[in-house]
Regions:
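Terminal leader/tail segments of proteins
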Residues: 1-90
Length: 90
């Protein structure tokens, strides 16, 4: 797993690590949502309240983007019972 992805997964605050980043949101719905970015594009959105993980390559079908997405998918599959919604574009 990429070290920057591991760091993002461990973060409890908004933070960037090179081309990777994470930030948190609590919209009016009361859901706790964490966003993971790669080169400024949201590639993974986690709703901690509804236990869902939404993956998208944001139109960037590159090996590096897919590697980061696979790392997020692997971590959430192995460590949670969250529903994974994979919406990668080809």
């Amino acid at each position: 797993m990429l070290k920057s992805v591991e760091r993002c997964l461990e973060c409890k605050t908004d933070r960037s690590f090179g081309n990777h980043g994470t930030w948190w949101s609590m919209p009016c719905t009361g859901d706790i949502i964490q966003y993971f970015t790669y080169h400024g594009n949201v590639i993974c959105r986690v709703n901690w309240t509804q236990k869902t993980v939404y993956l998208t390559n944001s139109g960037w079908d590159t090996r590096s983007t897919n590697r980061a997405l696979n790392d997020y998918k692997h971590w959430f599959t192995e460590n949670t019972d969250f529903e994974i919604i994979d919406k990668r574009e080809n």
